[in-house]
From Swiss-Prot:
InterPro entries: Dermaseptin_dom. This is Cruzioseptin-14. Expressed by the skin glands. It is found in: Secreted. It comes from Cruziohyla calcarifer (Splendid leaf frog).
Length: 27
């Protein structure tokens, strides 16, 4: 359903954000 899509996109965005933070911290 629509909420499943929203949840999936939200999780993907969250993972990408955490990844970006980790990269920034590592540099």
């Amino acid at each position: 359903g629509f909420l499943d899509i929203v949840l999936h996109v939200g999780l993907a965005a969250g993972k990408a954000a955490l990844n970006a933070v980790n990269e920034a911290v590592n540099q």
